[in-house]
Amino acid sequence: MTRSLKKNPFVANNLLKKINKLNTKAEKEIIITWSRASTIIPIMVGHTIAIHNGKEHLPIYITDRMVGHKLGEFAPTLNFRGHAKSDNRSRR
């Protein structure tokens, strides 16, 4: 179910403060965050945000096509290594 339109999109307060501080100083630096549930809003465009995937922080450059999506969509948490190899020689 989607979020109600009468509510604003969720953005973590500490992440919003960091974005606003960088926008006022007009600086570009990597912002580290654990908030995967935060929605990307237009003031984030052009920044690089390092999103935690459970093991490390992955730096993601925010573009205008990402607006409206969640940060966690761009940092995959699972690493699929493929199905088990069917080795018939070891069964003999």
From Swiss-Prot:
Key words of the record: Chloroplast, Plastid, Ribonucleoprotein, Ribosomal protein, RNA-binding, rRNA-binding
Gene, per the UniProt record: rps19
Molecular function GO labels: rRNA binding; structural constituent of ribosome
One Pfam family, short name: Ribosomal_S19
Assigned protein family: Belongs to the universal ribosomal protein uS19 family.
Name listed for the protein in its UniProt record: Small ribosomal subunit protein uS19c
Keyword Transport: no
InterPro entries, alphabetized: Ribosomal_uS19 (IPR002222), Ribosomal_uS19_bac-type (IPR005732), Ribosomal_uS19_CS (IPR020934), Ribosomal_uS19_SF (IPR023575)
GO biological process, one term: translation
Keyword Ribonucleoprotein: yes
Role noted for this protein: Protein S19 forms a complex with S13 that binds strongly to the 16S ribosomal RNA.
Main location: plastid
Localisation per UniProt entry: Plastid, Chloroplast
GO (cellular component) term, any one: small ribosomal subunit
